[in-house]
């Protein structure tokens, strides 16, 4: 079996497992909590992800593109910059909490956002060995670690929700997942451990590479999370919570497609660039066509069955999430086709 096929299988297994866990937790949590709680959590997640996107300087991508995997000055500098970024992002998120609570008229945000921000701090300590594993298309260990961390965080969230019946319980999952994931990555992945170091030449390479990454991630933030900010401000808390459930379910096939593209297809593109032969380009085009058709088919099926599926799986409070999910799938079809 080729390395790319093996990687695709592990990514697929990881995504199926992750989406299965997420769906199971959604079924349980929608019975423990109220729709407004999921709207508040959607805003928290959007703010946290937006901060991560607009501050993305391309450290991960630069390591993937760097031809020398043994350059410790480069790797240690990237890890140190990542640590600093995590500290800064956490501080910014904490400072934004009362502002966000006022803008969206949600007192829970003042508590939930600082809790979720701890995940940004912890993620900054992720080892560069994880990126090197992705570069080698060695996805087995990271995939198992991601699933274990997700399972642990879901258990923590369900326990907190059952005990408190508060929206704040949902925010606990972000730092718990980050702590479990980063800890396991440091323990399980083999290789040289990162240490704090700043090399001026390496910093310059990261800055040069990150200019274009930052611009693209800002655009991704606006496209991917702009709806949450608009709807969070204009819809009622209950309606926005139902929309958040619909978006989460409709996004399952879309997220799977993007995860596969980001992890495997990028290596196929790199191989085609490194070996610019007609055969390599033909293989790349064939892989891209299969990927696109598969993604479109999965999203189309999800859109068709969403109303009936949500009607069966969720209680009547979330019935409107069905047609919402179908409409979202139409938008996702255009996104993937483009």
Question: How would you name each of these model-derived features?
Answer:
Residues 60, 128-135, 139, 159-163, ...:
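C-terminal transmembrane helix end/exit motif
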Residues 54-71, 134-135, 246, 250-288:
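Helix-loop junctions and terminal segments of transmembrane helices
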Residues 80-105, 110-111, 155, 159-163, ...:
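Alpha-helical transmembrane segments of multi-pass membrane transport and lipid-handling proteins
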Residues 3-58, 85-99, 119, 149-154, ...:
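Signature of the first transmembrane helix
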Residues 4, 140, 144, 167-168, ...:
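Interhelical loop/hinge segments that connect adjacent transmembrane helices in multipass membrane
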Residues 1-23, 72-80, 107-109, 141-143, ...:
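N-terminal membrane topogenesis motif
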Residues 4-5, 65-71, 121-147, 168, ...:
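Membrane-interface junctions at transmembrane-helix termini in multi-pass inner-membrane proteins
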Residues 110-117, 143-191, 208-209, 241, ...:
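Hydrophobic alpha-helical transmembrane segments
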């Amino acid at each position: 079996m080729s390395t790319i096929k093996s990687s695709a299988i592990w990514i697929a297994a990881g995504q199926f497992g992750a989406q299965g866990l997420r769906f199971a937790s959604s079924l349980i949590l929608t019975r423990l909590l109220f729709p407004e709680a999921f709207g508040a959590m959607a805003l928290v997640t959007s703010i946290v992800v937006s901060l991560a996107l607009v501050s993305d300087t391309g450290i991960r991508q630069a390591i993937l593109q760097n031809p020398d995997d043994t350059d410790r000055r480069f790797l240690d500098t990237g890890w140190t910059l990542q640590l600093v970024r995590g500290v800064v992002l956490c501080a910014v998120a904490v400072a934004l909490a009362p502002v966000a609570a006022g803008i969206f008229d949600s007192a829970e945000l003042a508590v939930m956002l600082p809790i979720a921000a701890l995940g940004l701090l912890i993620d900054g300590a992720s080892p560069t060995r994880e990126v090197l594993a992705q570069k080698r298309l060695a996805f087995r260990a990271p995939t198992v670690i991601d699933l274990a961390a997700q399972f642990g965080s879901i258990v923590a969230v369900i326990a907190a929700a059952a005990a408190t019946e508060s929206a704040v319980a949902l925010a606990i999952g972000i730092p718990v997942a980050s702590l479990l994931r980063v800890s396991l990555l440091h323990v399980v992945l083999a290789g040289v451990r990162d240490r704090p170091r700043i090399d001026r030449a390496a910093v310059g390479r990261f800055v040069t590479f990150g200019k274009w990454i930052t611009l693209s991630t800002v655009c991704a933030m606006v496209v991917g999370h702009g709806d949450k900010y608009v709807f969070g401000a204009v819809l009622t808390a209950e309606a926005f919570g139902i929309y958040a459930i619909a978006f989460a379910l409709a996004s399952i096939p879309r997220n799977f497609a993007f995860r596969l593209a980001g992890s495997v297809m990028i290596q196929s593109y790199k191989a085609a660039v490194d070996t610019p032969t007609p055969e390599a380009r033909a293989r790349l085009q064939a892989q891209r066509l299969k990927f696109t058709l598969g993604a479109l088919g999965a999203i189309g099926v999800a859109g068709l069955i969403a109303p009936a599926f949500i009607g069966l799986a969720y209680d009547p409070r979330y019935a409107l999430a069905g047609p919402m999910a179908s409409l979202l799938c139409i938008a996702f079809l255009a996104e993937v086709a483009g």
